[in-house]
Swiss-Prot record:
Its EC number is 1.16.3.1. GO terms for biological process: intracellular iron ion homeostasis. Belongs to the ferritin family. This is Ferritin-2, chloroplastic. GO terms for cellular component: chloroplast inner membrane. GO terms for molecular function: ferroxidase activity; metal ion binding. It is found in: Plastid, Chloroplast inner membrane. The keyword Plastid applies.
Length: 13
């Protein structure tokens, strides 16, 4: 994804 959070980073959200 575009954010910096661990979950979004990996593309889970």
């Amino acid at each position: 994804a575009t954010t910096d959070s661990p979950a979004t980073l990996t593309g889970v959200i």
